[in-house]
């Protein structure tokens, strides 16, 4: 058993602790003097504003989050619009091969498509004939039913509102309103060409060119052309379709855009069943 070691005197322990504390105090004081005073910095407020764009071309989506004008002029999104609304985007037209308005309407909920003959097409919704057609949100009462089955090559999307649209078409119509929204010029250059060959000697060519023209993109243009020829399983029946569309846009101000355009579509069938039994 080891002999017990003598305890240090209490006064010696206190002296050692006091000396250690006194030795550290100057170091703390020096650090406190060297630390710079922190002054809070107040940043200026940053306001970010933007406009929602309803264009569907290049979005890769079957819907749009931008405002629609078919049901009202309030620039409401499809979710905010208090009516039954369907939108067929450019992406869906291309992926499903929806070439004409009639083919598009066959994919829309609540729309009945009736082919009266090889050329004339009528639409019904909620038990009534659809007579309200819009182009870029402007009411257009087509004088011929042939225009009601135009080529989709010039359109960015097609909006369909089921029920009356009295806010945009006056008295409204209990059936539906079909709004065909055309393509707009882009701020960057783009060009697309397509060729299609199918059964019954189907031959189709498309060209779509868009981009800035002058004034650092404040003047833009777009040109779209398509031509199609085809025969059919019906004897002697042939199709000869064409579409031409051109538009110019100019920025007159931060919130003002002037647009002028021209569209022409033709249908020159041979051996159609129009007027025959």
Regions found by a protein language model. Name each.
Residues 153-156, 167-246, 252-256:
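Outer-membrane beta-barrel translocator/receptor signature
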Residues 39-41, 104-124, 151, 171-174, ...:
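Short, glycine-/polar-rich solvent-exposed loops and beta-turns at beta-strand/coil boundaries
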Residues 85, 93, 105, 158-163, ...:
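Non-catalytic regulatory/gating segments with a bias toward low-complexity or hydrophobic composition
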Residues 262-277:
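Flexible loop and strand-edge segments within Gram-negative outer membrane beta-barrel domains
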Residues 1-96, 102-110:
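N-terminal Sec signal peptide and the immediately downstream disordered periplasmic leader
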Residues 53-55, 198-200, 228-230, 265-269:
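Structural signature of outer-membrane beta-barrel domains
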Residues 45, 49, 102-104, 122-124, ...:
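Outer-envelope exported proteins of Gram-negative bacteria
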Residues 113, 122, 138-162, 180-182:
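Short acidic/polar hinge/loop motifs at secondary-structure boundaries
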């Amino acid at each position: 058993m080891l002999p017990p070691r003598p305890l240090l005197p209490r006064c010696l322990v206190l002296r050692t602790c006091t000396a250690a504390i006194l030795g550290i105090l100057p170091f703390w004081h020096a650090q406190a003097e060297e630390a710079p005073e922190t002054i809070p910095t107040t940043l200026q407020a940053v306001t970010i504003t933007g406009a929602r764009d309803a264009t569907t071309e290049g979005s890769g989506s079957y819907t749009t989050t931008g405002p629609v004008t078919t049901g009202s002029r309030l620039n409401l999104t499809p979710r905010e619009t208090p009516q039954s609304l369907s939108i067929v985007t450019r992406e869906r037209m291309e992926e499903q091969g929806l070439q004409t308005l009639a083919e598009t309407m066959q994919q829309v909920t609540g729309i009945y498509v009736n082919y009266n003959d090889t050329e004339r097409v009528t639409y019904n919704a909620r038990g009534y004939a659809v007579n309200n057609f819009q182009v870029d949100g402007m009411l257009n009462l087509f004088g011929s039913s042939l225009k009601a089955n135009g080529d989709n090559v010039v359109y960015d999307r097609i909006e369909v509102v089921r029920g009356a649209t009295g806010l945009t078409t006056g008295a409204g119509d209990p059936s539906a309103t079909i709004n065909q929204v055309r393509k707009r010029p882009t701020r960057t250059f783009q060009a697309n060409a397509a060729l299609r060959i199918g059964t019954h000697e189907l031959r189709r060519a498309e060209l779509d060119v868009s981009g800035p023209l002058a004034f650092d993109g404040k003047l833009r243009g777009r040109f779209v052309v398509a031509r199609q020829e085809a025969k059919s399983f019906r004897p002697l029946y042939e199709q000869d379709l064409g579409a031409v569309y051109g538009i110019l846009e100019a920025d007159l101000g931060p919130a003002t855009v002037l647009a002028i355009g021209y569209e022409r579509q033709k249908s020159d069938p041979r051996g159609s069943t129009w007027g025959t039994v």
